[in-house]
Amino acid sequence: MLELKTNVIQDPELKDSLDLQENDRVEIIGDAVHYIVNDHLNRVFNYTVDQQKIHAALITTFASGKKAIVVILDDIGYVYYVGDNNNDSYIINVPFSTESAWSSPSGLYLQRHRSSDENLNTDLPHIFCLNDPLDELTLIKFDGKKILSLFDSIVYVVGEIVVTHNKKEKKLSFWRSRFIDPESDQSIKSSRNRRRESSFSREKNPDLTRSDSIHYTANTRLSEKFEEQGLAYSTIFSHIESFPITGSTSFDSILGNGVLVITTLVKELEKGYMMLFRLVRDRSPYFLDSLQLHAINLSAIKSKHLQKIVVLSSKGKVSLESPMSPSLPIEGTFRSFRVHGATLYLEDTDGVQRYISLDNRASNSLVKWCLSVIRYVLPLREYEIFYTGHLYALFAFKLSHDEAFISSILACFTFFSRDKVHVEPIEDCNEAYSLSSKFHFKKEILIASQLSSHLDYSTFKNYLMPLAITLHFISEELRLDSVVKPRKDQLVALLLQITTWLKWPRYCEYYNFDIAETFLSIPLSIQVDVEEPVGPTSILQWIIECLRSQSTVPFYGLESYGLPHSCSTMFPQTLSLMQLLDCLLNPNMTLQNLVEEMVRLGISRKRCERYPFGILCIIFTVLEIAAEEYSPNWESEELRLVNRLDVDSFLHPKTPKWVFNKQDQEVKEIKALTSTVTDSTLVDTQSFHPYKVVTDMIFREDRRLAEVNKLLNYSSQITIMTEHFDVDLSSVPMQQKVAQCICVRTLSVPIGAGMLTYGSKNPLPTEKVTPRLFNFTLHLHPGTLIIQPNKEFVTQELTEWPEFNVGVALGLSISKFSKEINTSWIMFNRPETLTAYHAGFLFGLGLNGHLKALATWHSFIYLTSKHDTTSIGLLLGLASSYLGSMDAKVTKLLSVHISALLPVGSNELNISPLTQTAGILGIGLLFHDSCHRRMSEVTMEEILASNESELKNEGYKLAAGFSLGLINLGRGSNLPGMSDLKLVSRLQVGISSQATFQSLEAGSPGAIMALTMIYMKTNDLEVAKKIDIPKSRYLLDFYRPDLILLRVAGKNLIMWDEVKADYEWVKYQIPDIMLSQFDLQEKKVLSSDDLLLYNVLAGICFSLGLRFAGTGNPKAKEILINFLDSFIRLCHLPAKTHDERVTAVTVIRCTQIVALSSSCVMAGYCDLDVLRRLRVLHGRMEPVNYGAQMATHMALGILSLGGGRYSLSRSNLAIAALLISFYPQFPRTTQDNRAHLQAARNLWALAVEERCIIPRNQDTKQPCIVPLNVVQKSGAVQKLEAPILLPPYDSISSVSTLGDKYWNLKIDLDNNSDYRELLRESQTLTLMPYDRTSSKEEPLNLFPKLKDTSSPLWNLVKTSRLFQSSNSPLNVASLQESNNKTSLGVKLLLSMDFDNLTRDRLLSLQILLQFFESCWTGVLLNKFHSRQYLFLSRDLVEDLSLRVWEYVYSHNHNEESV
């Protein structure tokens, strides 16, 4: 008798890891419950705090279908859902002590604990149901006369079967449970109408003890609870059968072939029982039979293929039993066993640990798949016999999984042989056939004959044909995967052996063509006559027929051979290919629909590469065409399938921003590093930033950015060429004068430097950022003289605000997309003593929104230090970070620094005027665009305040004006709830220069700015007239000249749409009385008579610069540069008299305004025309005040904003921010804040817009240079080369890439509203490299370039064995040039080698040829029109097809003659 052999566990530590229990379970360990999934601890639930005993823990599924863990304690229970994306938990009330809990099909059963003195005659229920954690407990209703008594306890539950044990009657009862909805069952309610006067009397017995009284009271309360609540019924129990059994200790069950087997063990009698129940869908289970076994231990072992009962007899023999399949004895004698998953662990009489697994854990997935398919084909009983033979082959004969499967298949056929195969001893058999060849099955047939002699395969008579056909379809499925060809060949050889025995000549011929090696068939005569079915079905031949007819022809599938339809799901590749071909040949389906179908079927690009090359050619042709004509509605899966990762990266970004890593930085050569040390003029102070690779690409044609770097460098030594000076620099006083001029110029640089380095850093969490310090050292060249300004000149007061600006530049250099900026990082970078550097740093972080991460209590620590610049930086930074949010905490912080917001009668604030100025400006930022009435009223009162004090100076009133404008920005007359404030009329009083109080004159700039910002872009002509300048000379004399500039700019910003970039518009803005003075080229001397003209022109240029900010408008640039040249010329005119000097000051101020306006228009473009003029302004050595130098460097910074990666927006907030930053009243000295708070000069950061489009190579992940075609809404077309700044997004219609190196990518912004926002957020175009060398353009030069081409068809053809002979047509064609495509086709045909051609290769080639033939006609012509590959001309395809068909015919004819 055959016995299964076990394996010895060599390492005891591995005994629990040999097999995973592929389910989840819970275990009670002390005061905790462990949830274990696949033998790995998943979660731990601890109940130490509850101080209650854990009575039960189980996994169940409630009526809602949700899976949950239920833990029952003394009086409460916990429910934890464990499904996908569901971590809900509930606490349930348990009004009794729980004896046991069991999982049910719709929740759980709870069995309460019964006390020993409980009245046994009561009908008080003791088993309850819980169907949902939010529901009440429900009761069980009984169908029939049989009911549960108080002595019945649930001992086992499996599916709908509930097993109860009655201790009193000593019997097992089997019940069928059915769930009913308690809410729908209105008639079924718990009725307890009888009074329980004898058992549950409401009167206490005075003779009861204390403990009796407590128990009595508890039961009374329980009874009352059930009676009062009227619990509903949710489950019906129907009695099936009862058996008198004594002392049952354990229960288990197995299910097979519709029969449920429940086992129980009576250890005292050493007996086990099997109760068999027939399960019928939608019907009540019924009892079949009961069996008795002699056993000292029983347990169920369940695998994917087999379910058995493990029986250990008193003699130590172990066997696997099942009423539905043969018994499987295990070799040896054993003391004990245990089951873990599908593995049986045994301990033999010598104490050796052994194991055996019923699951087929073969490394060969083909065997697993074949077993799964056969399981569908064979009935359960026959399959268990088949799998039993497989287990015998594995464990009795120690075969490999492949050999065991083949042996079990062959055993089904050898059972019916007339002449039994001679059986040799197993040991000799293993030796004799250990060197068996690849394609014969002597060893397997020998084993199969032994299996067929021990197992009863007689019922397989009707299943031999289905088995053979099933294996045939498995082999056809394998033909669609070129990777598994060796497995397919082995299966085909097996099929050839089987069909030889069955005498199926057509099938034998079909398989014989596939076997290149000599196959040794073992003769065997089968007694059963199995008629040869039609066929054989060939999936590849079917594809050829479909392509030839260009329609889907019938496919003889499994159903045609009488096999169950459910088997079809086991052949996914065949089904998928049939659906794809149907889609391809459907005239109503496009190639894009075919791609969508592939995604729906789960076909990936990697899976496509495993198809035979003929099918792969079709699919890749479709994918390549679809890649050029992708649908904008495609998801990531479709785009990845067609290899358009560029489009996928844009439409479905995995990260919101592509941030350069430190690994992306350029690696410098030693020579470049040493040159920066030996030659100070080559130092590039900004070259360290990670975006340098992009900026270098943007300005790759010259060194303009390097020049800006040098001009805005304030931390390196400055070299001065002495020959450029007309004065003698040999004297110390003159040297000091020059040094002091250069010192002031250096101090004015940081704001511009901050613009240049904006957003260039992404610091690490542990990285400490330090500001670059000022370097005032001068080197006079030629020579070696080094000079520095006197220490008395460089005071703390002199450098305080420049140091503040250095800190702001450092904070702004940190990208707003950095994720590592938090409270800890800010505190890590805080110096021990607060400095102006750190104050500016806080402001810079706030401008980029990073102060939202700063904890509130840290803000209080900063503010209580009473450090003025720190308070200013923090207040403005918080207001900027919380821009427009009206955050309550930040409002409180700002309010306590503004006297106007304190309650009446409050003490005077001990706060500097500059801090209060920052506070009032911060209110405007915090309440931006909110139309907040209270804040609007306060700021307006501050503008018009008449009291004179150091606080209420022009700078404070201007800040109040900006704040009022920000609160109501661009709202115009649409100010809800503020009509009674009469903003326009009251502000107009503040604007008037004829005011009674001189303090109102100080408030005029603030009033002008407030009115301008409130009515910005509204085109309100009435308000514009009120702010406009008068047209007569007499009235103009009443106005301050600098206010004229503000009025002109303000009026134009209100009349936004009227501003035009042409000279006619400029001329129209000038009053008639000044037209005669309009031509600045005629000015030869400086005269105060022209002050009004200069201010009017500067105001016009300022408004023009803001109107076209960031657009790069060439006409606006031309106008502004023209005026800039004129003003620069005026700056060089001599100013000797007082009148001339006064005029010169105005000319310099107007020059800076025009320069800033020019830079605004060309922001980020680093335009050379503007740069040349700014370089001249920077290089002036004559005494120029600090403000003029600051304006020049701000113009330089805005011109090269972010190294060319950023530009300016034209939103309302952006224009307002630029108006505040470039306010045309610049400080005279570094300490000057009287007219305008210097910190506010940094609000330009709120106007920054990232518009630099950065293409990057998908393969290398590096930026690359790509031509772009940008179509604007006006119809203008721009040819650009990215990386480059794009025009404003709202003016772009479409962006598309050009060139031959990458797939063309077109982004249509007009027809896809989401694309504009995607482009704004990503700024990156990921491009797929692609060789666009087209055979259509150069068909004659294609062959010499085959090694470089990326065409998938040629990649397949040139690697095919058909073309790898010594006279390969590709080699021949590459050596000759011809102007005739037909001659190339002849060369290809003449050099064809058809040796060793298998059926799959031939059919694959036929598919390829048939596909290209069909592409010229019918449905495929419409889909592939003008896109057929021209290197395979139609003549070539016809000739090659003829040769292939001739070869097929000759091959078949030769076989027939043989």
Curated annotation (Swiss-Prot):
Q: Which InterPro entries match?
A: Apc1, Apc1_3rd, ARM-like
Q: Name one GO cellular component term.
A: anaphase-promoting complex
Specify residue ranges for compositional bias: Basic and acidic residues. 196-210
Its keywords, alphabetically, are: Cell cycle, Cell division, Mitosis, Repeat, Ubl conjugation pathway
A Gene Ontology biological process in which this protein takes part is:
metaphase/anaphase transition of mitotic cell cycle
**Repeat PC: residue ranges?**
873-895, 959-982, 1006-1024, 1099-1124
- Pfam families associated with the record: APC1_3rd (PF21282)
Query: Care to name a GO molecular-function term for this sequence?
Result: molecular adaptor activity
Q: Which domain of life is it from?
A: Eukaryota
| Region of interest called Disordered, as start-end residue ranges on this chain | 186-210
Quaternary organization? The APC/C is composed of at least 13 subunits: apc1, apc2, nuc2, apc4, apc5, cut9, apc8, apc10, apc11, hcn1, apc13, apc14 and apc15.
Q: Give the record's family classification.
A: Belongs to the APC1 family.
What does this protein's UniProt record list under function?
A: Component of the anaphase-promoting complex/cyclosome (APC/C), a cell cycle-regulated E3 ubiquitin-protein ligase complex that controls progression through mitosis and the G1 phase of the cell cycle. The APC/C is thought to confer substrate specificity and, in the presence of ubiquitin-conjugating E2 enzymes, it catalyzes the formation of protein-ubiquitin conjugates that are subsequently degraded by the 26S proteasome. Mutations to this protein prevent the exit from mitosis.
Q: What is this protein called?
A: Anaphase-promoting complex subunit 1
Q: What is the originating organism of this protein? A: Schizosaccharomyces pombe (strain 972 / ATCC 24843) (Fission yeast)
**Top-down, what is the taxonomic lineage of the species of origin?**
Eukaryota, Fungi, Dikarya, Ascomycota, Taphrinomycotina
